[in-house]
């Protein structure tokens, strides 16, 4: 079993919902972008508990748990590494809207595993929240087909995000 598969199995066994985000999710939506790691989103604080990963550590997985403080926009990040397998990063969100992203995700087969994948509009919300240059490029690629339903879904949810995210969305929307 791959590191990705083992991670999904553990999260499933522990009833911790997650969704594929990042370049893997972009690829599902037809936007190829090269990356070595696989990114998952979760919101359960249990993901940051070292004891959750004990069985994987026993199997030789390197687990790096980084907890955010109260001022951090994320609860934290967990990076899993094992040999030459693709790294798995679990971004642990702290906001209700991030849980909604996971709840709306649709299942797809990725690297032989069934995994919930964030919808296009939800990837846009996550990218607006991250706010980097690559994130803005990714948003432009997600919008290239001009899907009015995607725009409408982002418009409907954007008020849940911080003001700077709303401003970025307004600027992107004006550009067309």
Where are these regions (language model features)?
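Compositionally biased terminal segments of proteins
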Residues: 1-176
